[in-house]
Each structure stands twice: as structure tokens, then as C-alpha cells.
């Protein structure tokens, strides 16, 4: 196959989140595959031959046999900590269980959180070009893609996932790098805090597989209170949650106390800004002439914005930080769990995408410098 033909193939889009990896082909409406971005290794001794084969599990198989495994996330706060595991997960994305394709036949669009260490991007490029032999690669910022997915060119995107929360103001398609705000408080921190609160209520989850149970409780039972002080004074109605072993757990005030961490990171001794400040400060760091427009175009993206009551709480908090008569409008697209991937799918299927990527030839000539030249 001629190298040009390969470059003309449909690009693969990988939204490499700290918690969930979404993958599929450009031009598709939704990602073909989504699975937790972790690897599982058996923690017990195999005594029967011919039973469960393999020493490493990824994707649905890891979820299915979770109780038998030690679960490890290769990414923490948007940065890859274990490149061997990360490589294995990407390998699995191309395998017969997933995209069923050869990596050397498709250009790749990979997402990354803004203000990430440049080493992270260089290593990702090295893995894709040298191990997977991809013909071309483009690394894009998550928030910009989320805006693509909504069909706008102006807005401030608040993207809060499992590892990173960031706000990126974009005006008429121009991102303003100096105005970007990022904090490393996101969904996984809420899960950890919920585990601590549940321990205080008398239920202990200690293994890495049980931490996944806590994550599920968070997703199903937690909500954001519009007025936490008031809710603290009232008796919170307890919600019954059925655990995998059939026993039930009554979740009380922990339901709103855990996600409160997103707005008050000092609950766990973190000095970062809360989500509302992240948005407001990003807007305030932008030019005065643009602020009114940005306040009226706040777009939510990422799984941690899916808590019940999130939009109302954010609106009431941002109002306190904005000038008095300014109009604040927050839009929460329904598909915001996947909006980064959807934006990537749109961008990668445009003709102009070919001008943006770094080809294998450029990478071989310039090395990692080529990557920095073409990403922002």
C-alpha cells in the first residue's frame, strides 16, 4: 500500500482519559469502544489449569473478573505514570476485541489535557510512531474538541473528568493559552473522598477492586447540593445501595459531601481553586472585551459534570464571582460524557485535518520538536 493511501484512510480517534478511554473511527457519531483505563493482574495463585488464561486483563474482561485482580490505572491526573501499562491498553484498542485494525494503516488523533508536562506528549508520540508505526499523529487539547462537538466557535469549556479539571476560553476559534486554568481535582478525588466518608459511616472498601465499587456508588447516589450548609442542618434522607454481594448500604450525608470537594478542595487539604473559581478566573484572565460573551457561553464537558444538581450549583457560585448585571448561561450537552471524542471525530474527518497532523516522515526528521510545533 502506498503511504499516501494509508494517510487517506479513516483516522482513529482516541480520547485517552484518566478514568475512561474512548476509541473509534473519525466520522462516527459516538465512540465505538469505551472502557475503564486500567489494567488488572491476578493477585492469587492459579491452582487449576485450563481456567482463566492470561496474566493481564484489560477492558470488559478486567471489569468482569475485577474481584480477582489488582486494578491499576496507568494515568493519574492526566499524566501517564506507567508507560508499559499504557502501551498495553493502546495495543488492546487496536486488537481483534476492539477496533480490529492495524495501527500502521490509520492516522491517529490523541487527546491530552492542557498544561500537561511536555515530556508526556513526547513519550506518547514516541510510542505511537516507533512502537505502533502510525503514519501520522495529532495531539489535541480536550476542551477545544468539546467545543467542536457543540458546533460553537466561542465559549469557555469547563471540562472535568476523572483526573483533571480545566477551563479553556475560546473566542471565534482562537484559544487563549494564557487564560487556561487547570486544577488536579476531579472525579477520582471525589471517589477517594467518598471512600473516606463511607469508612466513617462504618463501611470499609480497601482493595483496588472495591474502589471501583465506590466509584459506582458515587455515580449512582451522589448529588451536588445547592446549599450544603442548609443540607448539613437537615436530616439527609438515606439512599439504599445494593452492593455486588447482595448486601445493602445506606448512604447518608456522604451523598452530597463527597462531590462538594469539587467546589471546596480544602475539604481534603488541597489549596486548589474550586470549579466555580476555575471558570470565573479563566474568564477574568481573558481580555475585558470578551468577558461578557464568555460568561454567556459556558459549556460543560466530562463525566464529573454529570452529578445531579451540578449546573444549578455552578450557576449560583459563578454568579457570586461575576459582575452584577452580567448574563450567565451554562449549557450542558447531553452527550458531554463523550463530547471530547465526538469533537475529535468531527475534527479528524475534516479535510483541513491533514494540514494539522505530524507525519511519520516529519517525526523521523525532527523528532519530538515536530510534535510541539503542531500542538498548542
Swiss-Prot record:
The keyword Transcription does not apply. GO terms for cellular component: centrosome; cytoplasm; cytosol; dynactin complex; extracellular exosome; extracellular region; ficolin-1-rich granule lumen; membrane. Keywords: Acetylation, ATP-binding, Cytoplasm, Cytoskeleton, Nitration, Nucleotide-binding. It is found in: Cytoplasm, Cytoskeleton; Cytoplasm, Cytoskeleton, Microtubule organizing center, Centrosome. Signal peptide: none annotated. SUPFAM superfamilies: Actin-like ATPase domain (SSF53067). SMART domains: ACTIN. The modification N-acetylmethionine is found at residue 1. The keyword DNA-binding does not apply. GO terms for molecular function: ATP binding. The modification 3'-nitrotyrosine is found at residue 4. Belongs to the actin family. ARP1 subfamily. PANTHER family: ACTIN (PTHR11937). Component of a multi-subunit complex involved in microtubule based vesicle motility. It is associated with the centrosome. This is Beta-centractin. It comes from Homo sapiens. The gene is ACTR1B.
Amino acid at each position: 500500500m502506498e503511504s499516501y493511501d494509508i494517510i487517506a484512510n479513516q483516522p482513529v480517534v482516541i480520547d485517552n482519559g484518566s478514568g475512561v478511554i474512548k476509541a473509534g473511527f473519525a466520522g462516527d457519531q459516538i465512540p465505538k469502544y469505551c472502557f475503564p483505563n486500567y489494567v488488572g493482574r491476578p493477585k492469587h495463585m492459579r491452582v487449576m489449569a485450563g481456567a482463566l488464561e492470561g496474566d493481564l486483563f484489560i477492558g470488559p474482561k478486567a471489569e468482569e473478573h475485577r474481584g480477582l485482580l489488582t486494578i491499576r490505572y496507568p494515568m493519574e491526573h492526566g499524566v501517564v505514570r506507567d508507560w508499559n501499562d499504557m502501551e498495553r491498553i493502546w495495543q488492546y484498542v487496536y486488537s481483534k476485541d476492539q477496533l480490529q485494525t492495524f495501527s500502521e494503516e490509520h492516522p491517529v488523533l490523541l487527546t491530552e489535557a492542557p498544561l500537561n508536562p511536555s515530556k508526556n506528549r513526547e513519550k506518547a508520540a514516541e510510542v505511537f510512531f516507533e512502537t505502533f508505526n502510525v503514519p501520522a499523529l495529532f495531539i489535541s487539547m480536550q476542551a477545544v474538541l468539546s467545543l467542536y462537538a457543540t458546533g460553537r466557535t466561542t465559549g469557555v469549556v469547563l471540562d472535568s473528568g476523572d483526573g483533571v479539571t480545566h477551563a479553556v476560553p475560546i473566542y471565534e476559534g482562537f484559544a487563549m493559552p494564557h487564560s487556561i486554568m487547570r486544577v488536579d481535582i476531579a472525579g477520582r478525588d471525589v471517589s477517594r473522598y467518598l471512600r473516606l466518608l463511607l469508612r466513617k459511616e462504618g463501611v470499609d472498601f480497601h482493595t483496588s477492586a472495591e474502589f471501583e465499587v465506590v466509584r459506582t456508588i458515587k455515580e449512582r447516589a451522589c448529588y451536588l447540593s445547592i446549599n450544603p450548609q442548609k443540607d448539613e442542618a437537615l436530616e439527609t434522607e438515606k439512599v439504599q445501595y445494593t452492593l455486588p454481594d447482595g448486601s445493602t448500604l445506606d448512604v447518608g450525608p456522604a451523598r452530597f459531601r463527597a462531590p462538594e470537594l469539587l467546589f471546596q478542595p480544602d475539604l481534603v487539604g488541597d489549596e486548589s481553586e474550586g470549579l466555580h473559581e476555575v471558570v470565573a478566573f479563566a474568564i477574568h484572565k481573558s481580555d475585558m472585551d470578551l468577558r461578557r460573551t464568555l460568561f454567556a457561553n459556558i459549556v460543560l464537558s466530562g463525566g464529573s459534570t454529570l452529578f445531579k444538581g451540578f449546573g444549578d450549583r455552578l450557576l449560583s457560585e459563578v454568579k457570586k464571582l461575576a459582575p452584577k448585571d452580567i448574563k450567565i448561561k451554562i449549557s450542558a450537552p447531553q452527550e458531554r460524557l463523550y463530547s471530547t471524542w465526538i469533537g475529535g471525530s468531527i475534527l479528524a474527518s475534516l479535510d483541513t485535518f491533514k494540514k494539522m497532523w505530524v507525519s511519520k516522515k516529519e517525526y523521523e526528521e525532527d523528532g519530538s520538536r515536530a510534535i510541539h510545533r503542531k500542538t498548542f
